[in-house]
Amino acid sequence: MGVVSISMPDELEERIDTFADEHGYTGRSEVVREAVRNLMGEFEDKRLEDRELMAVVTVLFDYETTTVEEKMMHLRHDHESIVASNFHSHVGDRYCMELFVLEGQLEDISAFVGKVRATKDTLSVDYSVLPVDDINMFT
C-alpha cells in the first residue's frame, strides 16, 4: 500500500483522531481511506446515469470569508446551464448560506458539486439529487 501525505488544519486532524477512537478505527489512515472511498462512490450510482436530475446544493461559510461568496458567484455563472435558481441568506451573526437548485445530467451536477466542495474556506457542503422522472411518484 502506498503512502500519501496530506495537509490539514490541526483541528480537523484532532477531530479525525477523536472520531477514530470513538468508532473503533485503528487510526486516522483508516478513517481517511473510508472517507475517500465514500466520496468517490457518491456519484457512481448507475441508477442516476442518463436521467434528467434535479439537485439542491447547500453551502455554509463564514461571513468574514468574502472570497467564498465571490467564488460561488463565479460557479453560478460558469454553470448557468444547470443552475435553475440560487439563494443567498445570512445565518446568525457569523455565517452565510448559499443554496443552489440544479437541473441537469449526473456528470454536470457532479462537476458542480465537486467544484463547490473544492472551494477553500467552505464550512459545509450538503446536497441531494432526485431524478426528475420520479417526481410523479409524489402526486
Swiss-Prot record:
Entries under CDD domains matching the protein: RHH_NikR_HicB-like
Cofactor: Ni(2+)
GO molecular function annotations of the record: DNA binding; DNA-binding transcription factor activity; nickel cation binding
Positions contributing to Ni(2+) binding: 77, 88, 90, 96
Transmembrane spans: none
Pfam family, one: NikR_C
GO terms for biological process, alphabetical: response to nickel cation
Regions annotated as coiled coil: none
Lineage: superkingdom: Archaea
Cofactor descriptive note: Binds 1 nickel ion per subunit.
Keywords: DNA-binding, Metal-binding, Nickel, Transcription, Transcription regulation
Keyword Secreted part of the UniProt annotation: no
Family note: Belongs to the transcriptional regulatory CopG/NikR family.
Stated role: Transcriptional regulator.
Protein known as: Putative nickel-responsive regulator
